[in-house]
Curated annotation (Swiss-Prot):
Name of a matching Pfam family: MutL_C
Gene Ontology CC terms, in alphabetical order: mismatch repair complex
GO BP annotations, alphabetical order: mismatch repair
Species this chain originates from: Leptospira borgpetersenii serovar Hardjo-bovis (strain L550)
CDD domains per the UniProt record, alphabetical: HATPase_MutL-MLH-PMS-like, MutL_Trans
Entry protein name: DNA mismatch repair protein MutL
Length: 596
C-alpha cells in the first residue's frame, strides 16, 4: 500500500473543526450566527462547565425544512450560495457550510428543528460526525441545538483549553458582541443553571449598550455617523474623559458581522490624538455598511478578520468618522490648548464601573492651566513626609532590604525641568526621573508587604460604592477570595454594584478607588496566580501613589528618594520597564570633552 492515502470524511471534518472551532465560545458564535440568518428574534444560550459538558442554543427562527435536516450536518452544504457570484455578495453570517459539520465532528450533537404550518418537527443525533438517530417529534417553529462533550474524541484539544471560568468569560463576551450587533433580538444567557443576563429587544443601539455596560455610560457616549463613497457608518464613541486601560471596550461591525479591522485600534488612537493619555483606550461601538463586493470576509476561517478592496480609503473614512464628532463635541479652543499642554498622569476616576473610564485631569485642577499660558508660575509647595501618606512615606528603611552596590549616591545638585534629579554617585554622574524612581521604590515596598502579608487593614469612615454591571459583579464575586489575598474586600450591593468598606494599609486614603479600579481592569478576564496578583497590585499602587512629573521636592525628600532607590533590587527600571536613571561615568564625560 502506498504511503499517501486519502483522508476519511470524519478526519477531514475534525481537521476543519480545528480551524473553525477553537473552543466552546466558537461553537456559540457559529450557532448564534445561524440563528440570526434564520431570522430569529429570540435566543436562549445555555452552557455548563464552560460549554465543554453542554451547550444549548434555542431560537424562534424559521427552522430547517425536513429534507434539509440531514444535509445540514454535512461539510460544505449551505443554503446561502450556489455560485461564486453569490459568494461575492453574501450578507449572511454563516455561508460556508462548515460550522455544523465541524461542531458535529468533535461532539455529541442533537439538532431539533421545525417550520411553520407543520404538525411535526424533526430530530437528528450525531456522534463524532456520524448520524446515529433521526426521528419525527411534535411540531414547533425554530431550532434547538444541543452540543455535549465537546472535543470528546480529540482529547489533545480539550487539554489545551483554559479553565472553566475563562471559557465562561469567553462565552459571555461572544454573546455580548452578538447582542451589540442585533439590538432588535432578545437574548438570554444561562451558565451552570444561573441566569447571567436577559436582554430585551431594543429600538436603538444606545439602549442595548446601556443594558450591557451600565446606565452611567449613557451620558458619556458620542453618536457618530458618516456616509461617503458607498460607505455608511453609525455608532457611538466615548468622550475623551471616558476610557479604559485596555482595548476590551472596542467593538466594530461590518455588514452586521463582528470583525477585527487591521490597524483599527491604531486608527482609533490616532483619531483621539492627544485627547487621551498614552495608556488610555476609548470605547467604541461602530457599525459599517458597505457593498459586499468591496470587502472580503473570507480571509479567516472563523470570519473574524476582513479585508477591504480600498484599505487606504477605508482608513481615511474611519478617521474622519471619529474626528468629525470629537471636533464638534469639544470646543476648538480646548482642542488647540490640549495639544500644547503637558498631560498630567490621571489621578482620579470619574466613574466606577469596570467598563468605565478614567478622568484625564487632576481633581480640583483646571486642565487649561499651563506654564505656556503664563510668564510666571507660582512655585508649588514642596513635598513633605506627611503629605505622602503612610504608604508612600520615605521614613525609616525596613531591616530586611540590602543596599544595591551599583548605585550609591553621594550628593545631589537639584532637579532639572521639574522632573530629573541630578546626582553624583561613587561610579559617575546620574540623571534620575523622579516619577519612575519613586514608582520603583513604592513597587518594591508594596510587593514586600504583600509577599510577607505584612500589612494591616483599615476601615473606611465612608464606604465606597462601585457601580458595575450584573455580569461584572458576578466576575468580581467569583474572584472574591483572590482579591482578599491582596487586602481588597468587596461585597455585593444590589445587583449592579459592589461596596468597599476597608482597605489595606499600604494604600493611601483618598487614592484607593482609582487603585482598585485600575487593579480590577488589569485582572479582568485573566487567569492569575498569587504572585501575579501581588505584582499587579504593587504596580497599580506604585503608579497611582508615586511622585509626579512637575511636583516640587524639597532637598531632604530628594536625598531620601536617592537613598531609597539605592536599596531597590532593580533601581534602574520602573515596574513597567521604563528607565529610572541614566548614568554618565567620569570616562564618558572625559571622552565627550575630548580629554581622552
Amino acid at each position: 500500500m502506498g504511503k499517501i492515502q486519502e483522508l476519511s470524511p470524519e478526519l477531514i471534518n475534525q481537521i476543519a473543526a480545528g480551524e473553525v472551532i477553537e473552543s466552546a465560545h466558537s461553537v456559540v458564535k457559529e450557532l448564534m450566527e445561524n440563528s440570526m440568518d434564520a431570522g430569529a428574534t429570540q435566543m436562549d444560550i445555555e452552557s455548563k462547565d464552560g460549554g465543554l459538558s453542554l451547550l444549548r442554543i434555542t431560537d424562534n427562527g424559521s427552522g430547517i425544512d425536513p429534507e434539509d435536516i440531514e444535509p445540514a450536518l454535512k461539510r460544505h452544504a449551505t443554503s446561502k450560495i450556489r455560485d461564486y457570484g453569490d459568494l461575492e455578495n453574501v450578507l449572511s453570517y454563516g455561508f460556508r457550510g462548515e460550522a455544523l459539520a465541524s461542531i458535529a465532528s468533535v461532539s455529541r450533537l442533537t439538532l431539533e428543528s421545525g417550520i411553520k404550518n407543520q404538525k411535526t418537527a424533526w430530530k437528528i443525533c450525531s456522534i463524532g460526525g456520524k448520524i446515529s438517530e433521526k426521528e419525527e417529534i411534535p411540531g414547533f417553529v425554530g431550532t434547538k441545538i444541543l452540543v455535549e462533550e465537546l472535543f470528546f474524541n480529540t482529547p489533545v484539544r480539550r487539554k489545551f483549553l483554559k479553565s472553566v471560568r475563562s471559557e465562561d468569560k469567553k462565552i459571555r463576551d461572544r454573546v455580548t458582541t452578538q447582542a451589540l450587533a442585533r439590538h432588535d433580538v432578545r437574548f438570554r444567557l444561562f451558565q451552570d443553571g444561573k441566569e447571567v443576563f436577559v436582554l430585551p429587544s431594543r429600538e436603538n443601539k444606545k439602549d442595548r449598550i446601556v443594558d450591557l455596560f451600565g446606565e452611567n455610560f449613557r451620558d458619556h457616549l458620542l453618536e457618530v455617523s458618516l456616509e461617503r463613497g458607498g460607505l455608511n457608518a453609525t455608532g457611538y464613541i466615548s468622550d475623551p474623559d471616558f476610557y479604559k486601560s485596555n482595548r476590551t471596550g472596542q467593538f466594530v461591525f461590518v455588514n452586521g458581522r463582528p470583525v477585527e479591522i487591521k490597524y483599527g485600534s491604531t486608527l482609533l488612537k490616532k483619531a483621539y490624538d492627544e485627547l487621551l493619555p498614552p495608556n488610555g483606550h476609548p470605547y467604541c461601538f461602530l457599525f459599517f455598511e458597505i457593498d459586499p463586493s468591496r470587502v472580503d470576509v473570507n480571509v479567516h476561517p472563523a470570519k473574524k478578520e476582513i479585508r477591504f478592496l480600498d484599505e487606504e480609503g477605508f482608513n481615511g473614512f474611519f478617521l474622519t468618522l471619529i474626528q468629525k464628532e470629537l471636533r464638534s463635541s469639544t470646543p476648538v479652543s480646548f482642542l488647540e490648548l490640549k495639544k500644547r499642554l503637558l498631560r498630567p498622569t490621571p489621578e482620579t476616576f470619574k466613574t466606577s464601573s469596570l467598563y468605565q473610564a478614567h478622568s484625564s485631569s487632576r481633581s480640583g485642577e483646571s486642565p487649561l492651566l499651563s506654564r505656556e499660558l503664563f510668564t510666571e508660575v507660582p512655585r508649588q509647595e514642596g513635598f513633605d513626609l506627611d503629605r505622602m501618606g503612610p504608604g508612600a512615606s520615605l521614613s525609616a528603611l525596613t531591616d530586611n532590604v540590602v543596599k544595591h552596590s551599583s548605585f550609591v549616591p553621594k550628593k545631589h545638585f537639584g532637579v532639572l525641568f521639574e522632573t530629573f534629579i541630578l546626582a553624583e554617585a561613587e561610579d559617575g554622574f546620574y540623571i534620575i526621573d523622579q516619577h519612575t524612581a519613586h514608582e520603583r521604590i513604592r513597587y518594591e515596598e508594596v510587593l514586600r508587604k504583600l509577599e510577607k502579608k505584612n500589612y494591616g487593614i483599615q476601615p473606611l469612615l465612608t464606604p465606597i460604592r462601585i457601580d458595575v454591571s450584573k455580569q461584572e459583579q458576578e466576575d468580581i464575586l467569583n474572584r472574591k477570595k483572590e482579591y482578599e489575598e491582596v487586602g481588597i474586600f468587596l461585597d455585593p450591593l444590589g445587583e449592579d454594584s459592589v461596596v468597599l468598606r476597608e482597605i489595606p494599609a499600604y494604600m493611601e486614603p483618598g487614592e484607593e478607588k482609582e487603585i482598585i479600579l485600575d487593579f480590577l481592569n488589569r485582572t479582568e478576564g485573566k487567569e492569575t496566580t498569587e504572585p501575579e496578583l501581588y505584582d499587579l497590585m504593587a504596580k497599580c499602587v506604585a503608579c497611582r501613589s508615586a511622585i509626579k512629573k512637575g511636583d516640587h521636592l524639597s532637598d531632604p525628600i530628594l536625598a531620601e528618594i536617592l537613598n531609597r532607590l539605592s536599596y531597590c533590587e532593580n533601581p534602574s527600571r520602573c515596574p513597567h520597564g521604563r528607565p529610572t536613571l541614566v548614568k554618565l561615568s567620569r570616562d564618558d564625560l572625559e571622552r565627550m570633552f575630548h580629554r581622552k
